[in-house]
Amino acid sequence: MSVQIRPPRPGDGEGMARVWLSAGAYYADLDPALFQVPSADGLAESFEADIRATSASGDRLRLVAERDGQVAGWLTAHLEQPAAGAAHQLVRELGWIRLMVDALVVDQALWRQGTGTALLEAAESWGRGRDASMVRLDTYAHGPVAVPFYEQHMGYRRRSIYFAKRLG
């Protein structure tokens, strides 16, 4: 069963919603104080609207992984241009074009079968073709599947710690 990586097209919204809801259930089970299962009401239609609105945007990337005619996963990313005044910043990478992965989700039944790898490698190739010097993404720090995938399989390194505090 091979995976095909392609831009999303009309009709993919239902499959994208299915994968997103599955990811929500997985993460809500890991940490219910932080994650929730998204509302399914109108979700497929929301994905369809996003497909129509952003399919040909220059600095935004949307990819779908298809296996046997079904959406198996998807990825969204965007380019960030060098920051104004980057020479005055402490962080060197602010002077670079950066590929920011906003979301990468794969149907749980297809984990460890190359779908996430194919999506992320396609995004990296897209970024290289647009002069990106690095890729950045974030994931749940205690994710037992995602963290090893990024660090051990894909060669990503932890670069910072993200803090949060509820107010009220």
Give the predicted meaning of each segment.
Residues 1-14, 18, 22-25, 29:
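Conserved N-terminal entry element of GNAT/NAT acetyltransferase domains
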Residues 21-50:
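Conserved GNAT-fold acetyl-CoA-binding loop/helix
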Residues 48-63, 82, 100:
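A short helix-loop-beta-strand connector motif used in the catalytic cores of GNAT acetyltransferases and
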Residues 64, 70-78, 100, 105:
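Conserved beta-strand in the GNAT
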Residues 76-100:
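Conserved acyl-donor/pantetheine-binding loop and adjacent beta-alpha core of acyl/acetyltransferases
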Residues 110, 114-122:
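Conserved acetyl-CoA pyrophosphate-binding loop and the N-cap/start of the following alpha-helix
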Residues 111, 137-146, 164-168:
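Conserved beta-strand-loop-alpha-helix junction that forms the acyl-donor binding cleft
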Residues 120, 127-139:
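Conserved GNAT acetyl-CoA-binding A-motif
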